[in-house]
Amino acid sequence: MSLDTVVEDIRDEARARADEIRSEGEERAEEIIDEAEREADDIVDEAEREAERKISQERDQKLSSAKLEAKQARLEARREVLEEVHDDVEAQIADIDGDEREALTRSLLDAAAEEFDGDSVRVHGHEDDADLLEGIVADYDGFEVGEPVDCLGGVVVESDASRVRVNNTFDSILEDVWEENLREISARLFEE
């Protein structure tokens, strides 16, 4: 075997080995590229899913916020309507006059008088009811008209001796009735 043949065999072997290495390298490069493309696709898919989740979450939050805002607006509107109705009722009560006002005031004083037993008692009422109260109080022993109080009408009756104070004003009766019937009033107003 000549030296040229040996050199040629070594070259052929080196070329074959180089081709094999190149082929393996190309295969490996293709595998790496395929893997990188799969990973890139996975990253893009995950980013799209995350973006959709965020969009959905933001939409849900905005929708929830809008619903809450609408509910608060409805509640505020209802509260305003209830306040208007309450104010109208107060105005109607304040406008009660004549025999009806006297009968109501007398009835409220009768109920309050049961709490006092022979004590010296002061009866307070609306300043415009002073004459009315003087006439009614004259029928009760030991009762006298006291200073006016800020109310729609009715009476506040008190005695220093027993430290009892009874608030039978139109205002207090209205508030009791209003609180007891608020649910029904609301249901009737808003057809619930």
Swiss-Prot record:
InterPro entries from the UniProt entry: ATPase_E_C, ATPase_V1_Esu
Keywords: ATP synthesis, Cell membrane, Hydrogen ion transport, Ion transport, Membrane, Transport
GO biological process: proton motive force-driven plasma membrane ATP synthesis
Biased composition (Basic and acidic residues): 8-26, 50-66
Bilayer topology term: Peripheral membrane protein
PANTHER family the UniProt entry points to: ATPASE H+-TRANSPORTING V1 SUBUNIT E1A-RELATED (PTHR45715)
A GO CC term assigned to this protein in UniProt: proton-transporting two-sector ATPase complex, catalytic domain
Protein encoded by which gene: atpE
Keyword GTP-binding attached: no
Organism superkingdom: Archaea
Name of this protein: A-type ATP synthase subunit E
Family: Belongs to the V-ATPase E subunit family.
Biased composition (Acidic residues): 27-49
Subunit description: Has multiple subunits with at least A(3), B(3), C, D, E, F, H, I and proteolipid K(x).
Compartment annotation: Cell membrane
Gene Ontology MF terms: ATP binding; proton-transporting ATP synthase activity, rotational mechanism; proton-transporting ATPase activity, rotational mechanism
Function: Component of the A-type ATP synthase that produces ATP from ADP in the presence of a proton gradient across the membrane.
Region (Disordered): 1-66
Transmembrane annotation, as ranges: none
